């Protein structure tokens, strides 16, 4: 009889984490333990699955290594989503991405080592590359110079995972995502715009000049990448860019939201400058040939992903889920 797979998901109540929990419960007979401090997480994101006997929820902090280690016992696969989600906050709190980023990854890896857990998936991002401009950047780019503490923390976490995988016979998969959007977002440009316009529908403050352009990816497209990458990995450590091959500007996102909210004559108040916030990378493109060679493909382009996510967030707003 085949053993039931047991997943341990840090940050499993957050935006991407909750969707991963839901897809695992919906498509497998596996058991899932969510380990989350619920600083931004939401139980309602699980829907009816909240009562599924295969789902266990532990409200605790990944910084608590003894408790984390005890909770992880008996699991075989870790998804590590727990991290600081407010990239701009580091300008006022410079250590946030260490304590809520790199340090968390260290603790997860230590808990895995102590418990003999051998498989980890980690969500990284384009911030590891730094300023790369409009040329699509491949995974083996030689000049990775992050300009934000968020990007530095993600890169440090990647190298820690690589080291633990090689030293302690683990297998690690890192996904460097484009900007992820979808239902139940807890942060991001579109999320911020919707909340600002709900409070002040006649004017929208837009950080920067609105010409920042980036690739966006629907959350369900990245979940399909996880499903594919779970099936087989011979290397101790591997990493992939996962995103759309096109892009969309901040002003275009604002236009989509204004239209879908049915607003008229909204004044855009640009704060000026190329960056939306300190250490923002205003333009980047990802080379996604490596992940596409596995057979993965995104269903939605950047614009479609943003449009779908805006519709879902407006539905959440209508139903009182966002305050």
Show the residue positions of the predicted features.
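N-terminal Rossmann-like NAD(P)+-binding domain of SDR-like oxidoreductases, especially those catalyzing
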Residues: 1-180
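Generic recognition of short, well-ordered alpha-helical segments
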Residues: 19, 44-45, 70, 92, ...
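Residues in well-ordered alpha-helical elements
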Residues: 66-69, 88, 95, 106, ...
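A glycine/serine/threonine-rich, flexible loop-to-helix segment
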Residues: 135-136, 187-196
């Amino acid at each position: 009889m085949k053993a039931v797979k047991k997943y341990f998901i840090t940050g499993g109540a957050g935006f991407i984490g909750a969707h991963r929990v839901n897809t695992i419960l919906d498509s497998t007979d596996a058991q899932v333990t969510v380990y989350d401090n619920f600083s931004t997480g939401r139980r309602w994101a699980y829907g009816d699955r909240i009562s599924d006997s295969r789902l266990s929820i532990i409200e605790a902090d990944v910084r608590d290594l003894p408790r984390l280690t005890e909770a992880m016992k008996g699991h075989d696969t870790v998804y590590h989503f727990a991290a600081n989600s407010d990239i701009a906050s580091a300008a006022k709190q410079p250590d946030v991405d260490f304590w809520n980023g790199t340090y968390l990854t260290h603790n997860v890896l230590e808990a895995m080592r102590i418990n003999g857990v051998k498989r980890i998936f980690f969500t990284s991002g384009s911030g590891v590359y730094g300023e790369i401009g409009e040329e699509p950047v491949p995974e083996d780019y030689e000049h990775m110079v992050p300009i934000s503490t968020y990007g530095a923390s993600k890169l440090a976490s990647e190298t820690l995972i690589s080291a633990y995988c090689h030293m302690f016979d683990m297998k690690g998969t890192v996904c460097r995502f484009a900007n992820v959007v979808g239902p139940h977002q807890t942060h991001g440009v579109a999320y911020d715009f919707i909340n600002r316009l709900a409070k002040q529908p006649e004017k929208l403050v837009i950080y920067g000049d609105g010409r920042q352009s980036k690739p966006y990816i629907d959350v369900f497209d990245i979940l399909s990448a996880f499903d594919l990458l779970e099936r087989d990995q011979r290397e101790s450590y591997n990493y992939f860019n996962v995103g759309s091959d096109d892009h969309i500007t901040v002003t275009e996102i604002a236009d989509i939201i204004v239209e879908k909210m049915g607003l008229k004559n909204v004044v855009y108040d640009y704060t000026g400058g190329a960056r939306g916030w300190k250490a923002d990378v205003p333009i980047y493109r990802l080379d996604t040939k490596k992940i596409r060679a596995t057979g993965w493909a995104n269903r939605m382009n950047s614009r479609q992903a943003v449009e779908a996510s805006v519709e879902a967030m407006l539905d959440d707003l209508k139903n009182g889920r966002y305050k």
